[in-house]
Regions:
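Short, solvent-exposed loop/edge segments of extracellular or virion-exposed proteins
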Residues: 27-31
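Accessory beta-strand-rich segments of carbohydrate-active enzymes
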Residues: 33-34, 38, 43-179, 192
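Boundary at the C-terminal end of the N-terminal hydrophobic targeting segment
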Residues: 17-21
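Sec-dependent N-terminal signal peptides
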Residues: 4-13
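Catalytic cores of secreted or luminal carbohydrate-active enzymes
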Residues: 179-198
Length: 198
């Protein structure tokens, strides 16, 4: 009887852990991405929504920081946690996005900054990628191969001096000659490859 009780307890724990994952989204990045130090990735997706729900929470995770635009409007400035992944709790941001959506076509754009190194206050996952999920009746926006993604080459490393070794951030140079003007706006016509599921 004691073994039977332990077996039921174990099955319950496994089922509970599986149910908690419940994600329809996938971690995505681009074939060109090597998850190197100071990597910047641009993601975008156009979605059609017949009727915007009253509330829609997006669950967003990235290592390390991200910026979110919806229909050209900045919704999140420097989201994400400066600590990296943890095996003991969640590390995604819940973001209410319904006020930024409209009936019809919507453009979601996310810029991800992957530190690519650990510091005293950050644990590097080793993965430059995005996880995005917003699901409600009649609406499903999930990161998958239908998203577009590219390494944003305008963001570059600099020469020394570098930040203190305790910090995971890097110095940043932005080369405006390589800017992808309007990539985060509706109607962008530039070429971006489809994302890869990792």
């Amino acid at each position: 009887m004691k073994h039977y009780f332990l077996l039921l307890l174990l099955i319950g724990c496994i089922a509970s852990g599986h149910a908690e994952s419940g994600w329809k989204a996938h971690w995505i990045n681009t074939e060109r991405c090597q998850s190197e130090t100071n990597t910047w990735l641009a993601f975008r997706k156009t979605v059609h929504i017949d009727k915007v729900p009253q509330t829609l929470t997006a669950r967003i995770a990235a290592d390390s920081k991200y910026w979110l635009w919806i229909n050209g409007r900045l919704v999140v400035f420097e989201g994400g946690l400066k600590r990296g992944p943890s095996p003991y709790d969640t590390y995604y941001d819940p973001v209410e996005i319904a006020p930024y959506l409209q009936n019809g076509e919507n453009t979601i754009a996310v810029l991800v900054w992957h530190f690519g190194k650990s510091g005293f206050s950050h644990v590097n996952s080793g993965l430059a990628a995005l996880l995005f999920e917003a699901v409600a009746p009649g609406v499903e926006i999930v990161s998958d191969k239908s998203w577009q993604c590219t390494v944003y080459d305008a963001y570059q490393d600099t020469e020394a001096p570098y930040p203190n070794y305790r910090l995971p951030e890097s110095n940043i140079r932005f080369d405006a000659r390589m800017e992808m003007s309007g990539w985060n706006q509706p109607g962008y016509t530039g070429k971006m490859p489809n994302a890869e599921i990792i």
